[in-house]
Amino acid sequence: CTFCDYHTDTSLQPFEVNRPVLEQVTGRYGMLDVINSGSAMELDEDTVAMIADIVRKKAIHTLWFEAHYMYRNRLSDFSARFEPAVVKFRCGVESFEPTLRNRWNKGISSDVTPQEIARYFQGVCLLCCTEGDSRERILNDIEIARRHFEYFSVNVFCRNTTFVRRDETLVH
C-alpha cells in the first residue's frame, strides 16, 4: 500500500520471530487475534502449523486473521486448518471511499461495495488522519463499518518513510 513501509523490516526467518510471541498465548479467553500487518495466507508454514496447534491445545474457540481482499475466495480453505475454532477475517480496506482506496493502492476495485466485502469478511481496518482526509469521511466510514461488520478498527496514520503525510489537525 502507498502509505505502508512495514515490508522493510521483514525477517528472512519469520518463524524465529513469531514463535516466541506465539509461545505466550495462554488461551485464557478462548480467543486469539493474529495481527501481522499482512495476509494470513502469507504467513510461513511453521507459523501456521503452530497457530493450529495452539488452537487445539489452548481450546481457542474464535480465531481472527487479517487478509487482503484478493484472498477472499481462499478464506474457507484456510479456515479449515484451524478446526474446531471459528475463524473470522478482517480486511484492511482503510476506507470505503473508492477514490481514496485507489490513491492508496489498496488493490480493491472501486466498484467493490461494503456489502460485497461483508460477504467474505467479518471485520475491517480503517485508516484516518492522512493529508487530504476529512472528519466527514472518517465518520462516514465508521458508520458504514458499524452497519456491515461485526468488528472494525480505526487506525490513526503514523508518520513513516512514505510520501503520505499525517494531518495533525485531524489527529487532535
Mark where each language-model region is:
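Conserved C-terminal portion of the radical SAM core fold
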Residues: 110-165, 172
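Short, solvent-exposed loop/turn segments at secondary-structure boundaries
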Residues: 44-46, 101-105, 134-136, 164-167
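Short cysteine clusters
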Residues: 1-4
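Distinct, well-ordered alpha-helical segments
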Residues: 43-52, 72-82, 135-138
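Core AdoMet radical
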Residues: 6-20, 28-45, 55-73, 86-111, ...
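Short, conserved loop/helix-junction motifs that constitute active-site signature segments
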Residues: 55-59, 80-84, 118-119, 146-148
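Long, ordered, amphipathic alpha-helical scaffolds
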Residues: 16, 42, 165-172
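A short, acidic, amphipathic alpha-helical segment used as a generic capping/interface helix at domain edges
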Residues: 17-24, 141-143
